[in-house]
From Swiss-Prot:
The gene is secA. Its EC number is 7.4.2.8. GO terms for molecular function: ATP binding; protein-exporting ATPase activity. HAMAP family: SecA. It is found in: Cell membrane; Cytoplasm. It is a peripheral membrane protein. Keywords: ATP-binding, Cell membrane, Cytoplasm, Membrane, Nucleotide-binding, Protein transport, Translocase, Translocation, Transport. NCBIfam families: PRK09200.1 (NF006630), PRK12904.1 (NF009538), secA (TIGR00963). One of its GO terms (cellular component) is cytosol. This is Protein translocase subunit SecA. It comes from Limosilactobacillus reuteri (strain DSM 20016) (Lactobacillus reuteri). The lineage of its organism: Bacteria, Bacillati, Bacillota, Bacilli, Lactobacillales. SMART domains: SecA_DEAD (SM00957), SecA_PP_bind (SM00958). Part of the Sec protein translocase complex. Interacts with the SecYEG preprotein conducting channel. Has a central role in coupling the hydrolysis of ATP to the transfer of proteins into and across the cell membrane, serving as an ATP-driven molecular motor driving the stepwise translocation of polypeptide chains across the membrane. Monomer and homodimer. Part of the essential Sec protein translocation apparatus which comprises SecA, SecYEG and auxiliary proteins SecDF. Other proteins may also be involved.
Length: 787
């Protein structure tokens, strides 16, 4: 382990030395650029564009282009990027991750690689975690880009397709991650080229890259249509599971956060629903609803995993504490929670298109990211996204004091200590930021502070509209701010007058998060740009993380230490080590889970790319689709002939071929079995193809205008492809749920899914070709058919 660590540190040092040399080259242009007039500096952009067109690479232009952007920033924004920011910019241009501490000016760092990559004209997407940050950064940094002659666009969910298209045409576009994903899916569901908004995925620079590519990696983006779900079963299963007793009828595995019926629970279910065997195949729908009702009632927690607002269940992002507007838990879990909370059950939706962020961002030609905390996940970034994580030195040394964790036996004693610490710090006017992991914790702590008459603001999933404003003021003298997780990321906490002298911002964590990275983000809010500050975590044996991992070992340790007092506090390296190893286990589990999702999703990715590529060819075709249709007709006929000419000649089913021809290709009584006798299978295929070609020519005559014929071809193909593809997504989704149950009998669920998924896809292609052939041959021509 020590050797691996040594190698990492060495390779980081080597990489920083290399980047530093390039940054020195950028610095060497500083004097030359400062002597140019505004017009001369602005003219550099067109000069770079010309050089790029003539074959000069962006890498070669980097020192000069960065220097232009840097000088432009000084003149337009009054900000001049430091040497370490130039280094960060180089990392970003090279398609890697720049880990830069909070307050080190990531937004300004990004301007240099964004400007350089905009020169190619292929488009740069700057991705932020919310629309507020998109708008803020596009407005502030857009002044610089516009001054340098680059167009800037903002993409958001309120825009019309025309406005979106304009935004994507810009040299530089600001957008949230979800909007890019939904635009991609909508583009691949469009039936007219004019309805598409994107123009290829060239270079993405992702702000808060860990939040988007790690924390949200498992979140699929889904476009749904109405399904056929029923709310009755959700209510029945909810009523049933509410009667069950813990550890008698059901058991919970805290480590994996799963819940299942015991034998006793299964018997009760069979009696309640009047069944012989709960796990008979015909009861699949019921068992699925039962599983979701159990999860909803005994795993999913109100005010932690979700909130209820205005009679609606809204998901809470477990990493940021923000409400995720418009998102719903999939696979019926959302409906099960609605049944649990007694609100209206919204009908289940059928998935029409979906993609995960992992596969969306891997489609970019070049991907880069920046964050204050990525090093703990560097292996995942390397393995899944092929990005290296480079820690950029701070401009000034970090002055923050990170104090060791304090552990208390109970939640009550822990919160009493937290309130006591807040009182002491508040008395001298030191601003305090308190981090909590759940909405209910922040509200509980708020009540305790009210009792002590300590003025404070609460920032959680329920009021994130004001979050940027609240976070901005958190560094003022006497401010006390309670924040669920790290809501308000992306907004700097600047210290108010006189705060530096009394110790800077104090950060108090009320619980360790299951990810070390989130803890580091909380600490990192203090001590920006060499400011003083302090951070400390308060823990208890009743915390979630402690209960899930290592609680028993720590309890035994406390007993050995003879710690019985309710209010006793322990500081110990052993405890800190236990907490960190618990976090590493959770991180490992989460990584495995994300990797697992990716392996399954890769099966769909390959299939999605094939379908979307074919669709795009059809939508963009401007002459004729005969080259697509004729091979389709032939393959369909070939399959049918092969199927009916198996074995000896005497066993051939020629009547079956005639029946197929009459159903799909021709009018009844056009051919008989006699017409096929004496022909080889290949001759039969050629014979039937003559009829298909005849019908095609007939349709051309009827439509007389090639543009109308092309439109007819597109209508037929797209209707069939889209209908079969959405059904296929649904079937694959259901199969993926059930394949996990096949992990017995030495069968690997992933291999099962890959194999069956391949066969299902092959079958879907055959069905598409059959249906397209039938629809084309048998449809009557009507004018003004819409796709």
């Amino acid at each position: 382990m020590a050797n691996i660590l040594k190698k990492w540190i060495e390779s980081d040092r080597r990489e920083l030395r290399r980047i530093n040399k390039i940054a020195n080259k950028v610095e060497s242009y500083a004097k030359q650029m400062s002597e140019l007039t505004d017009e001369q500096l602005q003219a550099k952009t067109d000069e770079f564009r010309e050089r790029y067109k003539k074959g000069e690479s962006l890498d070669h232009m980097l020192p000069e282009a960065f220097a232009v952007s840097r000088e432009g920033a000084k003149r337009v924004l009054g900000l001049y990027p430091f040497h370490v920011q130039i280094m960060g910019g180089i990392v970003l241009h090279e398609g890697n991750i720049a880990e830069m501490r909070t307050g080190e000016g990531k937004t300004l760092t990004a301007t240099m690689p964004v400007y350089l990559n905009a020169i190619s004209g292929k488009g740069v997407h700057v991705i932020t975690v919310n629309e507020y940050l998109s708008k803020r950064d596009a407005t502030e940094m857009g002044q610089l880009y516009n001054w340098l002659g680059c167009s800037v666009g903002i993409n958001n969910s309120e825009m019309s397709p025309d406005q979106k298209r304009e935004a994507y045409k810009a040299d530089i576009m600001y957008s949230t991650n979800s909007e890019i994903g939904f635009d991609y899916l909508r583009d691949n569901m469009a039936v007219y080229k004019e309805d598409q908004v994107q123009r290829g995925l060239n270079y993405a620079l992702v702000d808060e890259v860990d939040s988007i590519l790690i924390d949200e990696a498992r979140t699929p983006l889904i476009i749904s249509g109405p399904g056929t779900g029923t709310s009755k079963l959700y209510k029945q299963t909810d009523r049933f599971v509410k009667q069950l007793k813990k550890d008698v009828d059901y058991k919970i595995d805290l480590e994996s956060k799963t819940v299942s019926l015991t034998d006793e629970g299964i018997k009760k279910a069979e009696k309640y629903f009047n069944l012989k065997n709960l796990y008979d195949p015909e009861n699949t729908a019921l068992t699925h609803h039962l599983d979701q009702a159990l999860r909803a009632n005994y795993i999913m927690l109100l005010d932690k995993d979700y909130v209820v607002q205005d009679g609606e269940v809204l998901i809470v992002d477990s990493f940021t504490g923000r409400v995720m507007e418009g998102r719903r838990f999939s696979d019926g879990l959302h409906q099960a929670i609605e049944a649990k909370e007694g609100v209206e059950i919204q009908e289940e939706n059928k998935t029409m298109a979906n993609i995960t962020y992992q596969n969306l961002f891997r489609m970019y030609n070049k991907l880069a990211g920046m964050t204050g905390t990525a090093k703990t996940e560097q292996e995942e970034f390397r393995e899944i996204y092929n990005m290296e994580t480079i820690t950029i030195p701070t401009n000034r040394p970090v002055q923050r004091k990170d104090e060791p964790d304090l552990l208390y036996p109970t939640l009550q004693s822990k919160f009493a200590a937290v309130v006591d610490r807040i009182k002491k710090l508040h008395a001298k006017g030191q601003p305090i930021l308190v981090g909590t992991v759940a909405v209910e914790t922040s509200e509980y702590l708020s009540q305790l502070l009210d009792k002590e008459n300590i003025p404070h603001v609460v920032l959680n999933a329920k009021n994130h509209a004001k979050e940027a404003e609240i976070v901005k003021n958190a560094g003022q003298k006497g401010a006390v701010t309670i924040a669920t997780n790290m809501a308000g990321r992306g907004t700097d906490i600047k210290l108010g007058p006189g705060v530096r002298e009394i110790g800077g911002l104090a950060v108090i964590g009320t619980e360790r998060h299951e990810s070390r990275r989130i803890d580091n983000q909380l600490r990192g809010r203090s001590g920006r740009q060499g400011d003083p500050g302090l951070s400390q975590f308060y823990l208890s044996l009743e915390d979630d993380l402690m209960k899930r991992f290592g609680g028993d070992r720590i309890k035994a340790f406390l007993e050995r230490m003879k710690v019985n007092d309710e209010d006793a506090v322990i500081k110990s390296r052993f405890l800190t080590h236990q907490v960190e190893s618990a976090q590493k286990r959770v991180e490992g589990n989460n990584y495995d889970s994300r990797k697992n999702v990716l392996q399954y999703d890769d099966v769909m990715r390959e299939q999605r790319e094939i379908i979307y590529k074919e669709r795009q060819q059809i939508i963009t075709e401007d002459k004729s689709l005969k080259w697509v249709l004729m091979p389709m007709f032939r393959r369909t006929i070939q399959r049918e002939v092969d199927q009916h000419t198996l074995g000896d000649k005497k066993d051939w089913d020629l009547q079956g071929i005639v029946d197929f021809a009459e159903e799909v290709l021709i009018k009844p009584d056009t051919i008989t079995v006699k017409d096929l006798e004496g022909k080889s299978p290949q001759e039969m295929v050629d014979y039937l193809m003559t009829f298909a070609q005849g019908v095609y020519k007939e349709k051309q005559k009827q439509l007389y205008d090639p543009a109308q014929m092309l439109e007819f071809e597109k209508v037929v193909i797209l209707r069939v492809v889209d209908s079969h593809w959405t059904d296929h997504i649904d079937i694959m989704d259901q199969f993926r749920q059930s394949v996990g149950l096949r992990g017995y009998g030495q069968l690997n669920p992933l291999v099962e899914y890959q194999t069956a998924g391949y066969h299902m896809f092959e079958q879907m292609i055959a069905d598409i070709e059959y249906e397209t052939t039938r629809l084309f041959m048998k449809s009557e021509i009507r004018q003004n058919v819409t796709r």
